[in-house]
Regions:
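Aliphatic-rich helix starts adjacent to a transmembrane/signal segment
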Residues: 72-89
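N-terminal single-pass transmembrane signal-anchor helix
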Residues: 46-73
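Extracellular/periplasmic head regions of type IV pilus-like filament subunits
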Residues: 94-200, 206-207, 233-236
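N-terminal leader/signal peptides at the extreme start of proteins
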Residues: 1-50
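Chalcogenol-based redox active-site neighborhoods
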Residues: 69, 90, 229-232
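Disulfide-bonded cysteine motifs in exported proteins
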Residues: 5, 152-155, 228-229
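A short, surface-exposed interaction/processing loop segment used at functional sites
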Residues: 202-230
Length: 236
């Protein structure tokens, strides 16, 4: 209701003719400015301009609108980024299981992989057999620059090209030796700037359930891949 009144006020101030504006501002002074009424009367308009009081009112309204809108925009942005982070892990989960079930690296063993990789890198989600053929890829090329320390445990969310503000990395909860990879995988997603890009770290393992936890990092700091398999379920 307050926001609607403020919007109406802005439109009246900016769009009405001078005589109508003068009457409207007089009414505004009586109802909102109280004892500033006399000061408002003493202010002289320059030709085609506004009084100091009127400019102060407009500046105040802009400040109020900014205070109302900016936090909501930030929340919406964070929610969108976190939803995309969950989708990243869903994509990696599906790719891992396709790699596992179909023995796509052709080694005769059903196993997972800890590599995002790139074209020509075998035993990776980007190129299971190392053929260099994009049709064999289980994930697209944007993952190549979104991964941290590919093939090993990720520590800090610092990657060349984050996806929706998140980097991905291999989880420290899972080994990277051949025996471990026969039964489990683990990927995590962490934000490049805590509380401005996202609030939560995410992870997923062979049980296929996305886990999440609120980052402990201060605002603006890189995420530290804090989610583990013991975290609560987070949807997806």
């Amino acid at each position: 209701m307050i926001s609607f009144f403020i919007l109406v006020l802005c439109l009246r101030l900016l769009l009405k003719r001078e005589e109508e504006l003068k009457g409207f501002l007089l009414s505004l002074r009586l109802t909102l400015l109280g004892d500033l009424k006399m000061a408002a009367r003493e202010q002289k308009k320059t030709e085609g301009g506004f009084t100091l009081i009127e400019l102060l009112v407009v500046a105040t309204i802009i400040g109020i609108l900014t205070a109302l809108v900016v936090p909501n925009l930030l929340k919406a942005r964070i929610s969108s980024n976190e939803a995309n982070a969950r989708k990243l892990l869903q994509t990696l989960r599906d790719a891992e299981y396709e790699y596992f079930e179909q023995d796509l690296n052709g080694n005769g063993v059903r196993d997972f992989t800890n590599l995002i990789g790139s074209s020509g890198v075998e035993d990776s989600l980007r190129d299971p057999r190392g053929t260099g053929d994009e049709e064999d890829a289980l994930i697209d090329s944007t993952f190549e620059d979104a991964v941290v320390n590919d093939g090993d445990t990720a520590n800090e969310a610092n990657c060349p090209a984050p996806k929706a503000g998140y980097c991905v990395g291999w989880s420290g909860d899972v080994g990277s030796d051949p025996l471990s990879l026969q039964g489990d995988f683990g990927w995590e997603a962490s934000m490049i700037s805590a509380h401005t890009v996202g609030r939560k770290d995410f992870s997923i393992f062979a049980d296929k359930v996305i886990k999440c936890t609120v980052t402990s990092q201060p605002s603006g700091s890189p995420g530290q891949f804090e989610s583990t398999r013991s975290d609560p379920d987070c949807g997806g």
